[in-house]
Amino acid sequence: MDHQDSQRGLLAQWIEESSRIVFFGGAGVSTESGIPDFRGAKGFYHQDREIPLEQVLSIDFFTVHPQAYWEWFVQENAREGVAPNAAHRFVAGLERAGKLSAVVTQNIDGLHQRAGSERVLELHGNWSRLICTGCGERFTLDDVAAARSGEVPHCPACASVLRPDIVFYGEMLDSDVMEGAVRAISEADLLIVAGTSLVVYPAAGLIDYYAGERLVLMNATPTPYDSRADLIIREPVGQVFEELGRRSRRP
């Protein structure tokens, strides 16, 4: 058995022995679904663009230039074939089996829900949901055709500009979501952290609430928390869970 097989085997064993698993995921969970991560070599931050991504995704930029934001949004949502990958499907299966307490995700793509997960805590929101900046009414992308065309969408009720239900740079994370994440992680008997560099706070600091003895870090590059991990896996996230899925189906 090689080192990778040994690591996967240990992770499979820990999953089998656990009943309060929390999966804490970042952008690297969705790269195998066709969505670039942020800080990888091919990530959003390394793409040539006229306006830096952090500026496009700031609340100040959106407030002043909503048209430019929605044009970027349509371009990013034009990616073909984006669908849940093996990681999303495996995690959803853990929830159905009664072994998963929660998914805590930094992603805004909604792929965990599309895979069937229901206990999802979205730290940074979900860009398939819209909120009216005037009356606070909520909509989905399917409710407002303009949001998919690159036009600035307006509220059908009060005509104010609609914004995506995400946490822009310059905004605070939702306190209820953070409290739910802290509670789930503090009660977990296995914490699997995948596809995140753990350098963005306050999200990265959630690991400090984990009191268990089995911390798994699964990321392509080292993280500031590696010294605290009980298992470190340097493989693509979806690839690992695809293999774990095959193992679980074997007689």
Can you annotate each of these PLM segments?
Residues 1-251:
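Conserved catalytic core of sirtuin-type NAD+-dependent deacylases
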